[in-house]
């Protein structure tokens, strides 16, 4: 684990959705190294347990549960468990998402469309809506929404995923304006191409060795969770701008 001088998130509690794999898991590990107490959720209980075991083995203070953020009852249970375990939520990272089919709109299946929007956009609303009362009561917090380049400029055959990320960008801006006076920051971060399972599904012919690892894109997430970012809100940022920075 990091030395005490490096623990810029000491005293913070972070809830990370989709925290059991890929970028979410890397953020969870980085936050734990930086001194935060971390709570993760993911749909696969085995993945959640593996992530908890790995991060605890490195000395991190972390807990988590399996759950589906597209289901209101699961969201209530996840947030209640985080608050019961750690007493507060200072940072929310909305990372959970699914890709859906890479099909043109004319051929896009309705059931797939509904699933992607339900998880990526309705899930974003549900978890944020459930966490906000705790942040508003403390008049403090940082919400970080994981976006995508296709949410900023739509691309053919990205379907519901691109639309959901465009919605996330709008959600970030309006929420930032609504809660700024309460001391809560809201920003979006685009990790860009990263060596994850989702990227491999989106680009099966791509050589993953040409891409940065999830650990390499986390510095900006640590910064936005820290008090050093207290003046940053309503922004759509790029993780690549922070590649190589020490955390």
Model regions and ranges:
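Residue(s) in the substrate-gating loop at a strand-loop-helix junction
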Residues: 148
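Alpha-helical segment proximal to the catalytic Tyr-Lys
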Residues: 133, 176-181
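Substrate-binding pocket helix/loop in short-chain dehydrogenase/reductase
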Residues: 103-105, 109-117
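Conserved glycine-rich cofactor-binding loop
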Residues: 13, 20-21, 44
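The beta1-alpha1 cofactor-binding region of Rossmann-like NAD(H)/NADP(H)-dependent oxidoreductases
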Residues: 45-46, 66-78, 110
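C-terminal helical subdomain
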Residues: 181, 188-189, 196, 205-247
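Active-site helix of classical SDR
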Residues: 128, 164
């Amino acid at each position: 684990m990091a030395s005490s001088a490096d623990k810029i998130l000491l005293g913070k509690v972070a809830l990370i959705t989709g925290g059991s794999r890929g970028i979410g898991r890397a953020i969870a590990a980085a936050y734990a190294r930086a001194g935060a107490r971390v709570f993760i959720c993911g749909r696969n209980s085995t993945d959640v347990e593996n992530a908890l075991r790995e991060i605890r083995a490195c000395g991190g203070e972390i807990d988590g549960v399996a759950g589906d953020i597209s289901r209101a009852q699961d969201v209530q249970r996840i947030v209640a468990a985080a608050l019961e375990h750690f007493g507060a939520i200072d940072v929310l990272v909305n990372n959970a998402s699914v890709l859906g089919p890479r099909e043109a709109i004319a051929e896009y299946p309705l059931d797939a469309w509904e699933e992607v929007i339900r998880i990526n956009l309705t899930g974003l609303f549900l978890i944020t809506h459930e966490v906000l009362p705790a942040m508003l009561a403390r008049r403090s917090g940082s919400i970080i929404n994981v976006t995508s380049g296709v949410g900023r400029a739509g691309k053919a055959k990205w379907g519901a995923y691109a639309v959901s990320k465009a919605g996330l960008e709008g959600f970030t801006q309006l929420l930032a304006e609504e809660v700024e006076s309460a001391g809560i920051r809201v920003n979006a971060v685009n990790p860009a191409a990263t060596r994850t399972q989702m990227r491999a599904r989106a680009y099966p012919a791509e050589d993953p060795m040409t891409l940065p690892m999830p650990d390499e894109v986390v510095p900006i997430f640590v910064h936005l969770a820290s008090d050093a970012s207290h003046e940053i809100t309503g922004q759509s940022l790029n993780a690549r701008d922070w590649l190589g920075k020490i955390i």
